[in-house]
Amino acid sequence: MTRPTAEFLRAVSAFRRYAHAERLPDWEQRFAFGLADIEQVFESAVAAAPVLCAPAANLTESFAAGRYVPSSIADELVSAGAVQIAHQVRNRSLSPVRIAELFLGRIEAHRHLNAFITVNASLVMEDAHVLDHRLRRGEDPGPLAGVPVGVKDLMSVRGYPLTAGTKAIEAKVQERDAAVVARLRAAGALIVGTTNLHELAFGINSANPHFGHVQNPHYPGYIPGGSSGGSAAAVAAELAAIGVGSCTGGSIRQPAACCGIVGFKPTYDAVPREGVFPLAWSLDHIGPITRSVEDAAIAFEVMAGLPEHSMLPQTAITAPRIVKPRKFFYEMLDDEVRMAMDAALARFRAAGAPIGEVDIPGIELAPGIQLITLASEGTQANWDLLARHGDKLGEDVRLRLETGQFYLAIDYIKAQQLRNQVRQSMIASFGDADVMIIPAMPVLPPRSGTMTLDLGGKTVHVAPTLTRFTSPINFCGFPALSMPCGRSRSGLPINLQVVGRPGADATVLRVARWCEQLAAV
């Protein structure tokens, strides 16, 4: 594929009755920076295959000053994880009403973070009193009893307007919960509000032009990640114990990496997407953002409708068998990210985990496959919105949606065929290993407003760079967890990913818990 000509772009947009020829220069520029990845896809042969269906430095003084240190019983409560809060509520040593009051107060005191779009304090208190009455009657509300949860404003929440982070749709108050939210409520969770996001969940920095740019609570001036930046910021700032996120190319794991916390993307379709505003049907996943692996496990159990305590064993976890890819995931790395990954793998090996190295044929095609798939599906899902209200969209999201119209059916189909081949290569690369360990991002969290970075002597665009190691896991549909493994010399967080085979969510969570316990020693 060569760079699309102005004539081609003009003809396609006219055919689709999207008459905005004045935007041709923007469309051409947008194609230019992804062209090399796209060309790799078109120059690759397709085998006969079906289309896929569906070391840590001390914090600097400035960052250390931003850390939240508990100094009272109330502070200890908001710092507690979901498991601890639920335990205290279930044994009636802690009132849901007290929890609601404390977290609502913290959310109000941290409005400058723009972590939430809507908080209905009356509804939160009403739900808390209902939980309290159930406890007084001797009922067990469930495994998330009284746990404060922030839900990405991409999902229907009863009594809240659904905005999808945009002004291009009418924000209607929802009469019922999305399936995942209903499960959280049924497990006793307190929904404390809907969280901010990158508009339409289509971006990596959560710089929302309509509801305010989400701020990184611990690393001021750096992005919180996206698109689930509000959920990550809320959890990192202890405004919620669990954040619900969506992930199309890395939107759970990448914000977790930018905020130095935990983000779990389950196997594709393990968590229902009913009632969730779509971006890309074959890439969208729903999962939890938390401050610990244990909290991620209990949240996932509820979100996926699984039995309590089914993800993490009550006994000691043995050293796992680990595989490390030789190329791609360990190429084009920031030096400090490489050092942190080397140190983490050395710790795992010293603790008894055998680590093998493998090649993954075709993995270099991943960026192009993701670009074509996401652009095509994202534009299809939002075409009516773009055609009718494109002028109400933020410029970055509008441009992404506009350029998706120029991919042809043959482009999309070939990308899916190659996607299936890469998926099979990824599965084969595990061999007899339990998990694959890779970096969450090739670079440190960038400063807000950064468009390009220098990496290995090359100038690279921020968006595809930050999702380079997460998006292949999305289009393969594998479970993966992002968790802290170190910090840079300046104190910025560095996360690794624990990746498993499709359906091996429990294995990923158990290995991640083993890694977490090892880091705490």
Predicted feature residues:
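An N-terminal boundary/leader segment
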Residues: 1-119, 123-125, 350-351
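Residue-level signal for inorganic ion chemistry
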Residues: 16, 103, 124, 296, ...
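Serine-dependent amide/ester hydrolase catalytic core
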Residues: 18-19, 82-90, 105, 196, ...
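Short helix-loop capping/hinge segments that flank enzyme active sites or metal/cofactor-binding pockets
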Residues: 63-74, 144-167, 319-321, 373-427, ...
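N-terminal, positively charged, Ser/Thr/Ala/Gly-biased leader segments
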Residues: 83, 93-96, 100-101, 105-169
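Acyltransferase
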Residues: 93-101, 129, 335-359, 383-388, ...
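Structural helix-boundary/capping segments
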Residues: 109, 186, 236-331, 342-351, ...
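Short glycine/serine-rich loop/turn segments
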Residues: 144-286, 327, 440-459
